[in-house]
Amino acid sequence: MRDVFIVAAKRTPLGRFGGSLTNFSAADLGAHVMKSVLAQAGVGGDQLDLYIMGNVLRAGHGQLIPRQAALKAEIPDTVDGYAVDMVCSSAMMSVINAALTIRAGEGDLILAGGTESMSQTGFYLSHRARWGYKFLMGAPENLTDLLLHDGLTDSTNGEGMGEQTEKLAAEHGFSRIELDEVACLSQQRAAHATESGYFDSEIAPIEITSRKGTQVLASDEGIRSDTTVESLGKLRSAFAKDGVLTAGNCSQITDGAAALLLASGEAVEKYQLKPLAKILGGSWAAGTPSRFPELPITASQKLLAKLDKTLADFDLFENNEAFSVSNLLFERRLGVDRDKLNVNGGAIALGHPIGASGARIMVTLLYALQQRDKTLGLAALCHGTGGGTAIALERV
């Protein structure tokens, strides 16, 4: 099996829901990171064999959003690509698929990642509208919020993912103060990383043109540097009366995109590319839908067994902070040291554009390894309906 190298990695700044990136479609955001990784590597779009992009909230946005993005990025129409929808794991699975394709010898240079505009997610009427409303008496036709329906609700039972996580937190005995401490640390680390310039290498700034002129967004909009455990403690429960989950200890609804350029050893030599890291392997796991926050643990354990490695072999970890519960599970059930986990903050502070987050945490992990002169990193995240993915990187 052939080695797979990461030769470029970029992400957009993450925009708050209804914030600066609201007028950028998922295709626009995807095009921006596609251009950025190609420019970073110094290769043309015509040298790509394939592109694979995660995307979840695509209803009403036209056919094949990754191809829309690729054409906007001036990648030739002779290069094809496809979308992956694995809810929050979409972008990571895109990277895993790209790596498997290269290992199998079916491609040498593949762009993979994910893109999501949660702000541009619309509403829909059911199929009843197509065939005519014969009788509406007692059965009104409501607009359905696609953000909730397709992105944040378990389709197997209609429960919200927040409600499910609230129950899981109670089962594990996680207290409000424990969850708020995780959230506060995320905000503090993200603020420190921003102020210290740690994100500068990974973020591809975006120009935003309006009637007021052109501005450049170069940092994440959701970070609240003044967050304290005390201020978080004043927030009301979000999903259950007297529950432990709040808007402050759950991830933010966000717009953004991230991408990585993967290459075989032959492509590295042919195009004189500079590898940043090697992908050691990826894994996935599934289980009871309502227990989705636990599944990154299973995926990580499978990956460690496959690689014949232990947690002690890894220097840094990223686990997507869909909820503070996610971090506590990763620490207590898997055994990851908090000092090694999400060292530059996570989705609670930065945001969680669901179709892009799997690639975003990989990009952040890669540059965190560089900043700290470390070698091995593992990234993982859960996804709705009961699953999780994990991937391991070795900086070179």
Swiss-Prot record:
State the practical use: Poly(3-hydroxyalkanoic acids) (PHA), of which PHB is among the most common compounds, are prokaryotic intracellular storage compounds with potential uses as renewable, biodegradable thermoplastics. Cyanobacterial PHB synthesis is particularly attractive as cyanobacteria use CO(2) as the carbon source.
Official protein name in the record: Acetyl-CoA acetyltransferase
Q: Which GO terms describe its biological process?
A: poly-hydroxybutyrate biosynthetic process
What's in the keyword line of the UniProt record? Acyltransferase, PHB biosynthesis, Transferase
Spell out the PANTHER family in the cross-references: ACETYL-COA ACETYLTRANSFERASE, CYTOSOLIC, ACETYL-COA C-ACYLTRANSFERASE
Entries under NCBIfam families matching the protein: AcCoA-C-Actrans, AcCoAtase_PhaA
**What's the miscellaneous note?**
Nitrogen-free medium induces chlorosis in Synechocystis, leading to the degradation of the photosynthetic apparatus and concomitant accumulation of cytoplasmic polyhydroxyalkanoic acid (PHA) granules which in this cyanobacterium are composed of PHB.
- In the UniProt record for this chain, what is stated about the effect of gene disruption? Double deletion of phaA and phaB leads to loss of synthesis of PHB, no visible growth phenotype.
Pfam families the UniProt entry points to: Thiolase_C, Thiolase_N
Q: Name one GO molecular function term.
A: acetyl-CoA C-acetyltransferase activity
E.C. designation(s): 2.3.1.9
Q: Is Disulfide bond one of the keywords UniProt gives this record? A: no
| CDD domains documented for this protein | thiolase
Q: Which domain of life is it from?
A: Bacteria
| Active site per UniProt | C88, H352, C382
Instruction: Tell me what reaction this enzyme catalyses.
Output: 2 acetyl-CoA = acetoacetyl-CoA + CoA
Which residue pairs form cystines in this protein? Answer: none
Q: What does this protein do?
A: When expressed in E.coli with Synechocystis PhaB, PhaC and PhaE confers the ability to synthesize up to 12% (w/w) poly(3-hydroxybutyrate) (PHB) depending on the carbon source.
Q: In which pathway does it act?
A: Biopolymer metabolism; poly-(R)-3-hydroxybutanoate biosynthesis
The UniProt similarity line reads:
Belongs to the thiolase-like superfamily. Thiolase family.
Oligomeric state and partners? Homotetramer.
